[in-house]
Amino acid sequence: MTLPPQAAQVLAFWFGADWQTLPPHQVAQRQRALWWGKDPAIDADCRSRFEALVQEAAANGLADWSETPEALLALVLLLDQMPRNIYRDTPQAFAFDELARQYTHLALAMGVDQELPAIARIFLYLPLEHSEDIDDQEYMLQLVRALAKSVDAADKATFDGYVDYARKHHVIIERFGRFPHRNRILGRACTPEESAFLTQPGSSF
């Protein structure tokens, strides 16, 4: 199966057109604002470009994308990353996490991650980091630690940062069994311990 044009558009938007040949740390630096920022203009751009495709993916209308590594990565991005921009601060931001997680596990079972550039593998793995299941968190740590050991020296600092971020997610799930910073958005009551935790720096992502 050739890469569907819409999948190619998702990948080019998220990583840049030269993402498969540029060193991972350079891709990460260039795309930083898109990936980790909270910019209403970027969110609006994601919405106008990809909301219809996100909804199609959520309705299993793009299941055939699971047949190639790059298309499967694009599918995971549509279900895991794009909703966090398009539906920021609403329950819908997390509504497709379970489906994204299923596709990530499928990709790992097929060894798809080994066919992708290192920077792409981070985003293939991220549904595990977003999961409130401790087994997923432990799997994520295992994967990202192994990946960080495999990259070139120039990329090491970037991937060590991803390991640190994964560790922070793991610690929260290990302690609370969920991400307390999602409670308000999802209408979940905080425990006293969670409320105290949320006053601390680094308690949300």
Language-model features, listed with the residues they occupy:
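Intrinsically disordered, low-complexity activation-like regions
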Residues: M1-T90, F94-F205
